[in-house]
């Protein structure tokens, strides 16, 4: 699997695969054949074969452990088992529902990082797979929820919105109310009175040869559906006269169809009249699931002279009723007053609300029922009711629309005219009852008359109500219908999703057993503890790394502070030394000028002053100044036997007194721990007793004779002697200057090709033993330098194989010999070929990487050099342990030994890499047990 963690369950073996020496992969030491454990191609000590986490020793013969990609061993108690593949998880896991999993996608098995994954049904998915699962889930939810429009195809929803709107009264067939039977009107108004049915899911129902508008997949076009609703007229037209409000925008928007122009149904045009039989075929069955329809009703308007327009000759109206003046119906309008129309405009969203529809229909019906005459004994009241109640110049909404005269159905007119006496006879005979004593009582004639007139009145009222809804309430645009259709589809989708979620939650609740509060609390606490433990384990490696970095930074800061302090001390020390050197230089220049002046005077004098026998005439008495010193000529003359006369008259007095000024050298030496006490030049130089003579001493030199310097005979002995003294002094000075100690480098100890040591020299071992025996608490150990004479003596002793030094030897001289021997090696202890690998390992940021790099460099050294380096580093670690007494910490020791142990082959990077070398050597001293484990 590619989840980032691969387990290697290799077979274990206690046998050595080869006869060569094997090294433990953990401790880097050789493993004897009796305690070797082989696993995954690597060798371990039997004691090193432990769990990395709990440090538990593992049994090689069992299989209760596993290995990750980093070659680390884990026991089964320290790792989790994956819920998906039942294999151990060695690195980190992904927890879902208190179950651990590999950090990989459950679908494509790709490794998941912490910023790009999600959980779905208890499984982990990457983002592409999660989107795919979401789409499949949404598709399943939409397929399971019937009757709603999928939200993913909004364009298709917008295209089919007009089909749904056609069922809601915006694009409907047109009919004449007077030619429709009562059953048709009652059925349609019954459907209209239940507006909540429009919110039900629509199914595919085959009606009148086409699929209902509720089917969004209907392949029929709008024109085909229009043809099914608007049938061809059969040469029957009713001519209407123009009305005052026929040209108004509200009238056109309320009555015009989106499929036709507004002029097709304008006042004065031909209105198609459908036969009753053809319209009955298009009536929706009450048992079907088709949405209720509120159709448009067109009512004929009277002419200006008060007469009705005439029908064609083949169509006639039997006994048309006279014009009646109807009473005004107090119906509360839902029209808004913000429309530019004079008579208001009803918003499509408000008009389509089921609450408004139901309330409007209820108000109209109640008003119609209240208009029935209560005094049934009075025919005059009944006649007045029919005269005043059926016609009005105002609509129920008080919008003052054109009058809607009542046009009686031909079937009802025939039924009324077929009665024995007729309507006029009944109206005439009704006056007899008014004068009778029983005028207020009910009789069968009045009841029958009321029953005969009530259906006609109800039809007329319903026609008016239908006209109210079609002309005023359902005044909406196609855009609002589209918005409503989209909103209904969204709500249906949400309802389906909520139903599925409720069903799943109910099933889960039924399956689960009731849990007590205490048990639930315990389970919750256990789950939280598990999650906290998981978080602690997941953050533990990062915290360990941060802690190591913090310690490294703290160490670096402390080292930098110590280095800064040391630099400041050395700077102060150098300033003091510089001041001393300046004063010494000035004094030497004055002495040199004085000597040159004296020599010039002697050469230009007529006689050789110091060999003149005349003590009084040619003697020059000079009192030397306090800054005078012996000349080289006087020193050589004294060594050759020319002794000056002793002057006992004057002895040294005040010049031998101690200088009263403060000795700055001692104070600075005590403060800054100077390596060695150097002669401090005071402002007043010390003068010997021989130089305090008040008179110049004279020696007797013969004029002719042999020279005591070169042994030659000369007639001008004085001049020859002067030249010989000068040449002798120069030879002695040059021989003394060229003297240098000879170090004991035995050629047999080196490889002639690589110039590396073949064995550990006895000088190194002897010096280390002497220092650890007598000088561990010596202040300034390895910092102070010894005298050259003592160094020569120690080298002579060690050359004669006298490895045991006397305790009286100078510690500083021994340390100087030790350092000088390491400095004079032709190839340093850390050889030239390992210089750059050593610098690379020192630049590693991680502690473990740096440690591994130093170990690899040490293993690459020649055996003798690796052994000497281990001997020196362990010795310096023991010296640093006494830093409270000798003031030599690991940092100070690294500064002293890094130039001798680590050298650049070209001597070009000594200054650049000086800080890195010092830090690296201090690291080796501080971690000697880890490096040389």
UniProtKB/Swiss-Prot annotation:
Pfam families per UniProt: LIM (PF00412), RhoGAP (PF00620)
Start-end of Basic and acidic residues biased regions: 643-652
Ranges where the record places region Disordered: 181-200, 304-338, 415-435, 605-628, 641-660
Record GO biological process: establishment or maintenance of bipolar cell polarity; negative regulation of cell integrity MAPK cascade; positive regulation of establishment of bipolar cell polarity; positive regulation of establishment of cell polarity regulating cell shape; regulation of actin filament bundle assembly; regulation of cell wall organization or biogenesis; small GTPase-mediated signal transduction
Domain LIM zinc-binding, first and last residues per copy: 22-80, 81-129
Modification sites for Phosphoserine: 353, 625, 738, 740
Domain Rho-GAP intervals: 753-932
Gene Ontology terms: cellular component: cell cortex; cell division site; cell periphery; cell tip; cytoplasm; lateral cell cortex; lateral plasma membrane; medial cortex
Keywords, alphabetical: GTPase activation, LIM domain, Metal-binding, Phosphoprotein, Repeat, Zinc
Compositionally biased intervals (Polar residues): 325-338, 619-628
SUPFAM superfamilies reported for this sequence: GTPase activation domain, GAP (SSF48350)
Marked site (Arginine finger) residue numbers: 783
Keyword Lipid metabolism set for record: no
Family matches, as InterPro entries: Rho-GAP, Rho_GTPase_activation_prot, RhoGAP_dom, Znf_LIM
GO molecular function, one term: metal ion binding
Purpose of the protein: GTPase-activating protein for Rho-type proteins.
Name of the protein this chain belongs to: Probable Rho-type GTPase-activating protein 4
Species for this entry: Schizosaccharomyces pombe (strain 972 / ATCC 24843)
Gene from which this protein is expressed: rga4
């Amino acid at each position: 699997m590619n989840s980032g963690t691969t387990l290697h369950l290799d077979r274990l073996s206690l046998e050595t695969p080869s006869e060569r020496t094997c090294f433990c992969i953990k401790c880097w030491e050789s493993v004897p054949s009796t305690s070797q454990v082989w696993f995954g191609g690597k060798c371990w000590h039997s004691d090193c074969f432990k769990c990395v986490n709990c440090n538990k020793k593992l049994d090689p013969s069992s299989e209760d452990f596993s290995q990750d990609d980093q070659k680390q061993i884990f026991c089964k108690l320290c790792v989790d088992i994956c819920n998906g593949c039942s294999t151990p998880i060695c690195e980190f896991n992904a927890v879902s529902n208190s179950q651990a999993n590999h950090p990989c996608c459950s679908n494509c098995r790709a490794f998941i990082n912490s910023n790009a994954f999600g959980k779905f049904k208890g499984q982990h998915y990457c983002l592409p797979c999660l989107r795919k699962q979401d789409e499949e889930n949404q598709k399943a939810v939409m397929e399971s929820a019937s009757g709603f429009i999928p939200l993913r195809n909004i364009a298709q929803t917008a295209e089919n919105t007009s089909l749904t709107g056609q069922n809601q009264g915006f694009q409907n067939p047109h009919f004449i109310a007077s030619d429709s039977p009562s059953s048709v009107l009652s059925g349609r108004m019954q459907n209209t009175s239940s507006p909540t049915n429009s919110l039900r899911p629509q199914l595919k129902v085959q009606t009148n040869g086409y699929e209902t508008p509720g089917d969004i997949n209907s392949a029929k076009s709008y024109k085909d559906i229009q043809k099914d609703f608007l049938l061809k007229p059969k040469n029957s037209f009713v001519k209407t006269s123009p009305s005052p409000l026929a040209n108004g925008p509200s009238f056109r928007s309320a009555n015009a169809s989106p499929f036709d122009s507004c002029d097709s149904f304008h006042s004065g045009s031909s209105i198609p009249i459908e036969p009753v039989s053809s319209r009955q075929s298009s009536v929706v069955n009450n048992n079907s699931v088709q949405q209720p329809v509120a159709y448009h009703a067109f009512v004929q308007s009277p002419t200006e002279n008060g007469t009705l327009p005439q029908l064609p000759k083949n169509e006639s109206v039997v006994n048309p009723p006279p014009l009646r003046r109807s009473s005004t119906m107090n119906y509360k309008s839902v029209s808004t007053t913000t429309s530019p129309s004079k008579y208001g405009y009803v918003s499509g969203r408000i008009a389509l609300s089921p609450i408004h529809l139901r309330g409007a229909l209820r108000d109209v019906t109640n008003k119609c029922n209240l208009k029935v005459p209560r005094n049934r004994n009075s025919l005059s009241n009944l006649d007045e009711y029919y005269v005043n109640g059926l016609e009005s110049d105002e609509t129920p909404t008080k919008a003052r629309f054109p009058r809607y005269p009542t046009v009686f159905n031909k079937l009802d007119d025939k039924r009324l005219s077929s009665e024995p006496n007729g309507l006029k006879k009944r109206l005439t005979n009704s006056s007899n009852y008014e004068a009778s004593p029983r005028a207020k009582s009910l009789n069968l004639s009045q009841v029958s008359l009321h029953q005969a007139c009530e259906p006609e009145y109800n039809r007329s009222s319903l026609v008016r109500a239908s006209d109210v809804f079609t002309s005023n309430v359902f005044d909406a645009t196609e855009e609002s219908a589209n918005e409503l259709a989209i909103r209904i589809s969204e709500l249906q989708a949400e309802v389906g999703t909520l139903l599925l979620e409720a069903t799943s939650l109910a099933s889960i609740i039924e399956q689960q057993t009731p849990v007590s509060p205490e048990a639930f609390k315990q389970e919750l606490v256990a789950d939280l503890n598990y999650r906290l433990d998981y978080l602690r384990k997941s953050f533990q490696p990062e915290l360990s790394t941060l802690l190591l970095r913090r310690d490294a930074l703290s160490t670096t800061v402390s080292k930098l502070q110590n280095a800064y302090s040391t630099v400041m001390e050395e700077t102060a020390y150098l300033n003091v030394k510089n001041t001393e050197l300046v004063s010494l230089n000035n004094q030497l220049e004055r002495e040199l000028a004085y000597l040159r002046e004296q020599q010039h005077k002697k050469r230009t004098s007529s006689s050789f002053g110091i060999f003149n026998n005349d003590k009084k005439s040619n003697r020059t008495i000079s009192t030397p100044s306090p800054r005078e010193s012996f000349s080289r000529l006087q020193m050589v003359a004294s060594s050759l036997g020319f002794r000056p006369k002793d002057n006992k008259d004057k002895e040294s007095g005040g010049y031998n007194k101690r200088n009263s000024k403060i000795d700055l050298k001692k104070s600075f030496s005590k403060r800054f721990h100077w390596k060695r006490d150097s002669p401090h030049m005071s402002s007043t130089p010390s003068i010997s007793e021989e130089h305090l003579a008040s008179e110049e001493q004279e020696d007797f030199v013969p004029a002719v004779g042999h020279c005591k310097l070169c042994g030659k005979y000369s007639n001008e002995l004085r001049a020859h002697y002067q030249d010989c003294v000068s040449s002798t002094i120069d030879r002695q000075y040059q021989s003394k200057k060229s003297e240098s100690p000879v170090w004991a480098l035995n050629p047999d100890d080196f490889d002639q090709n690589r110039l590396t040591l073949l064995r550990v020299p006895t000088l190194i071992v002897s010096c280390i033993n002497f220092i650890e025996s007598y000088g561990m608490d010596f202040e300034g150990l390895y910092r102070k330098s010894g005298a050259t004479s003592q160094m020569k003596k120690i080298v002579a002793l060690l050359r004669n194989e006298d490895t045991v030094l006397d305790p009286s030897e100078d510690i500083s001289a021994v340390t100087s010999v030790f350092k000088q021997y390491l400095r004079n090696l032709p190839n340093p202890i850390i050889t030239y070929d390992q210089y750059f690998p050593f610098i690379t390992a020192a630049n590693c940021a991680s502690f473990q990487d740096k440690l591994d790099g130093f170990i690899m460099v040490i293993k690459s050294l020649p055996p003798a050099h690796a052994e000497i380096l281990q001997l020196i580093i362990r010795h310096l670690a023991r010296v640093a342990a006494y830093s409270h007494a000798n003031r030599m910490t690991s940092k100070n020791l690294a500064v002293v030994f890094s130039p001798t142990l680590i050298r650049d082959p070209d001597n070009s990077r000594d200054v650049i890499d000086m800080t890195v070398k010092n830090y690296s050597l201090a690291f080796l001293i501080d971690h000697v047990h880890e490096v040389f484990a």
